[in-house]
Structure formats: C-alpha cells, structure tokens
Amino acid sequence: TLNSMEGYYCTADLTRFSKDSEKKFGIKQYYKMSGEYRMEMTSPDDVAGNYTVYDGKTVCQYNPRVEGKIIKDVPENKARNELFLGCFIKNYMQSEEVSIAVSKTDESRCTVLEAVIPGENKFTSTEKLWIDNETITPVKLVIYDSEGKEKYIVEYNEFQFNPDFEDGIFNIN
C-alpha cells in the first residue's frame, strides 16, 4: 500500500497540456522513496529512449539521438519531480489542506486523494490521485495549475509496489 511503499515501477501514459496544445508520451518510472528515480520515454518515436535519472545527488538526462548523449548536472525540475507518485505521497503527508473523496470510473470505484503542491508554482499548484479500491493501486495522477486547469495527467497501465530494482538502474554512467 501507499503507506508502506519503499519504491515502485510503472508504465504509464503521460499527457502534458500547454497553452494551446496537448502532447502524449509513453513512460516508464522507477522510484525509491529515498528520492532516487528514473523516467524513460517509450513513445512517441522522436523521444523514445530518452531518460532522466536522479541518483540522490545529481540529475542526468540521456538522449540517444544527440552527440555525447548525456547531459549531466541538469537543474532540479519541480514539474518533473511532481510526475512521480512518491512526490505526491510526500506532499499529501505534509499538506495542511488535503481531501479524500470517492469516485466511480468506468472500470472501478476509486478513492481520490488531493494535496497542495508546496512552493506556490502557478503551473503545478494542486494534485489528485485516483486509487482503485479493489487493487489498491494508482489509476491516475492529475496535476493542476493555480487556475484549476489540468497541466499533467499520468494514467497508470502497469504498477508494481516495492519491486527488486536492477543493480545500477539509478546510476549515472
């Protein structure tokens, strides 16, 4: 469950909304509650194979289509971090304004948790997490801007709590 989660692996569909467009991506996420993460892009083709890794100290981006392939010492990116379920859990636990609601989707009944994202960023202000009541796994995570508009939607396809991560999955090469 979320309370006892030490890490997770998932595949998901990510939708990013900007002023007049929306972009969809396939992603894989690997995350440890101690903060290390890896996010791989699986689609569309022009970004497939790109990934970002945080080893606990440094963020590194890898792009197989670029000479040199690796960008080290990437600045911390609040919006990118918020795409991880672990960040939602930390925000939810620390948030003074949280809410819990019940929702019925086409497939199942869900519990919806809402949290405020610290830092007063107008693009990432609040977030909601839908959890399937039967499987107790995340269904989707939505991040809203300060006007309540959807900025990011992560729709989980496959989700695994506390996986055995491959050695080196969070290493920066």
Where are the predicted features?
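Short beta-strand segments
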Residues: K23-I27, A48-T52, I70, S125-E127, ...
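Short, surface-exposed linear segments at secondary-structure transitions and domain or protein termini
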Residues: M39, K78-C87, T137-V139, F161-E166
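N-terminal mature ectodomain segment of secretory-pathway/periplasmic proteins
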Residues: T1-P64
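Gly/Pro-enriched, hydrophobic low-complexity segments
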Residues: V102-I172
